Amino acid sequence: MLTYSHQNIDQSDIDALTKALKDEILTGGKKVDEFEEVLCEYVGVKHACVLNSATSALHLAYTALGIKEKIVLTTPLTFAATANAALIAGAKVEFIDIKNDGNIDEKKLEARLLKDSKNIGAISVVDFGGNSVEIDEISSLAKKYNIPLIDDASHALGALYKSEKVGKKADLSIFSFHPVKPITTFEGGAVVSDNEELIDKIKLLRSHGIVKKRLWDSDMVELGYNYRLSDVACALGINQLKKLDHNLEKREEIASFYDKEFEKNPYFSTIKIKNYKKSSRHLYPILLFPEFYCQKEELFESLLHAGVGVQVHYKPTYEFSFYKKLLGEIKLQNADNFYKAELSIPCHQEMNLKDAKFVKDTLFSILEKVKKGYCG
């Protein structure tokens, strides 16, 4: 089965892990500091805090910004953690509709702020599939209204916006190191920023809110958590980061093949990456035309049966029963239609062009047999 995304683990990773496992200290040691340093250098920021998941990273980012009882404006087209973490931090969430590239619509965000900008604790955006949001425009809005900006760049480590790495322009940016993401530490995440005070706060909360005083003595100055990432995981992350650019090139090769082969086909559209952006290609979404919406489940099952691992990104967060109970029925037209249309097909560094051709041929072969027709 060709999965939609896949980790890259080679002998160099195994060697790095083996060496780390033989060290005296397995957690809370120098590898944590080293991983944070190389991550800062790669992204081009001053400070980083690595954690045991991107969800933990989001939770502490929201908490550090002091958003309790305030509103977080965010996208519905994301893994639920983007909104969940805000709720856990004591905020309310409000969803802003998306554009046809899956990213939050900065014009609709601006309209919401023009309507009422009071009690907004943060704007939290997601670089869908590894393709940057319009971060300059959104950052300008955040500064205009004096609202903190979080860039949930979980998909986008290594992506570029106007020749700069994604993760530099928000007050706090989040990366994920889950196995399907650009690099992996098994599970893991990070917050990066040029704001030392915010990162110091997050580092304090990462480890129970405890500070060392002298010898055996310490003090707990805040109610914190155990969100630490082990030295063993960090050793893997350090080695993974060395391979990232090469792996992104391989992903881009597969995506470029798809872009060319899928041009002007009668079944679906693809997301066009603007020339001032470079996506990490975490996902390769196809967007079925409306006459195929009702056949999506049939197509999904047929592709799996044929050995093409597909996934859907994402069910809008407000469609989960928990959020329906919390917020009531919400309908955002673009997010709803994107969910009806979207399928993520295999695109990762473990593939070659022969694999990509197999995906293309299989996809078209199945679509040719699908009986199109509008729902209802």
Language-model features and meaning:
Residues 25, 29-71, 85-88, 95, ...:
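Phosphate-binding glycine-rich loop
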Residues 59-115:
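Conserved PLP-anchoring active-site segment centered on the Schiff-base-forming lysine
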Residues 84-86, 141, 182, 232:
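Hydrophobic/aromatic ligand-binding patch that stacks against planar heteroaromatic rings
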